[in-house]
């Protein structure tokens, strides 16, 4: 008793609770490692006990990078949390995201609940809606916006923005100047998708500073990345908010402003519907809305357009930037592709979506640019249906969150030989690589609806850049990606370093 009398209240609390905490951790360790339904799947023992080590990589922006290291060590299947599994095989893409006769759908997990900018109002988009029936209803409304015929209608507008960007590069690089293509490509894709999503020219191309909307978008993606992580471990939420309260408050405020701006721009677009001849993603939707064939509020429309921008701006810009970097690092490949492009076209106006589809080397370069590294989000979680199902030949209990990290599958040495090397020739199909493992647009009915638009932007932009300019890196020794891409951070999407380039007008 004398020992207890000499203790302070906190010391007594620890003395009494400490053994209970240690017993709980020990019990958790024994159960999760030896008796849990996922006990047979490999992974670090600490991850089997708690999701916290994985969440730490999310907060660092290193989620894909750390998952890749785990897959290199453990193979195609990794248990990265007590209840979570990550896969990296081509077969897993089909099993998780595809449609299999006799199998139920693997619906999107709760991870997506934090992605919506209007989650507080319980408004979901074509990307964040988890319910298959509700998603199908949204997809029917916007289906025509991603058709080939719509893309053909929008091509002149898209090409106009690409040509504006080319002129901007000419101005920036005149007299030996340099242009940061990380910033430049981001501004261009933002203007393109912004016009398609909101019917408005935001004027990002040519700005010396980042457009405020892009800043709000990126900050919002950072916030949703934080929110997604917290959702996987709700008890951590109050603790994380306390220690990172200043950062969290700033991110929340920026996300709120982003939502307000999106709604403001949407209201302007709706008001102009009867007086504008411009076409965009919303044209048909607003026509049907006016005739009461579609019931969708302004905030629901804003949620769709916001997510179109989030999914179609930095993703596509990432692919353009990494592809340009790898081309400028490989003079032989750069010369071959430049020769193919300049031989194919009499002038820059002849460079179109249809004409670039015919260029075989350009096609392979773009596929490799999409693989290394992919512009996709870090993970794409789904829930195994009730009763369980098989993934990659293994039975997985129902309710288990399963995912493929697109970057991991694309860089897994079990799928690709020399996975960190930029080798467009692998897409000839003769290297023995498992090409189906690279799915930068995801897979199945919930894959990226804007795939055709993104591919067009990448092909036409790269072709026009190489047709117009002879380019070189400002720093020939630039290691833009870093070891295993650890120079590139992921907070929802990629955060990329500068890519400063010198460009001279080509003489043909």
Swiss-Prot record:
Any one GO CC term of the record: membrane
Keywords attached to this entry: Heme, Iron, Membrane, Metal-binding, Monooxygenase, Oxidoreductase, Transmembrane, Transmembrane helix
Top enzyme category: oxidoreductase
Compartments (UniProt record): Membrane
Pathway: Sesquiterpene biosynthesis
Cofactors: heme
CDD domains: CYP60B-like (cd11058)
Transmembrane segments: 11-31
Claim: Hydrolase is one of the keywords in the record: no
Residue numbers binding heme: 448
GO MF terms held by the record: heme binding; iron ion binding; monooxygenase activity; oxidoreductase activity, acting on paired donors, with incorporation or reduction of molecular oxygen
Signal peptide per UniProt: none
Annotated membrane topology: Single-pass membrane protein
EC annotation from Swiss-Prot or TrEMBL: 1.-.-.-
PANTHER family, per the entry: CYTOCHROME P450, P450, PUTATIVE (EUROFUNG)-RELATED
Family: Belongs to the cytochrome P450 family.
Function: Cytochrome P450 monooxygenase; part of the minimal biosynthetic bip cluster that mediates the biosynthesis of bridged polycyclic sesquiterpenoids derived from sativene, isosativene, and longifolene. The sesquiterpene cyclase BipA acts as a versatile cyclase that converts farnesyl diphosphate (FPP) into (-)-sativene as the dominant product and (-)-isosativene and (-)-longifolene as minor ones.
Protein name listed in UniProt: Cytochrome P450 monooxygenase BipB
Organism: Cochliobolus sativus
